[in-house]
């Protein structure tokens, strides 16, 4: 599993911005899979999902993929969309990688 912290600039509500961009069709490669107690998104091509935890501070996301050797594809797609669509709203992206046992 991969965990991410996305720090916004100037109080940007990144969770709402991501949901809006997906629902408006600006981000076509992802779809909202659930909106209950937070939300999660799925990539239309790559396996796995990204689960968001609602916090007042940074955006917290966990990338979950049953096939750990394919996690990088989901990570690459997500970080790429963040950098492309929200570069003016994001101060930093921190990525934590869990060890494989």
Q: Where are the language model's segments positioned?
A:
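A short, structured beta-strand/loop element
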Residues: 38-60
């Amino acid at each position: 599993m991969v965990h991410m912290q996305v720090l916004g600039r100037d109080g940007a509500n990144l969770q709402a911005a991501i949901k809006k961009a997906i629902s408006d069709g600006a981000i076509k490669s992802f779809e909202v899979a659930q909106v209950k107690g937070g939300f999660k998104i799925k990539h239309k091509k790559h396996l796995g999902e990204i689960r968001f935890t609602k916090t007042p501070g940074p955006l917290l996301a966990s990338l979950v993929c049953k096939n750990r050797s394919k996690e990088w594809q989901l990570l690459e797609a997500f970080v790429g969309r963040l950098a492309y669509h929200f570069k003016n709203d994001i101060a930093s992206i921190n990525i934590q990688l869990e060890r494989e046992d």
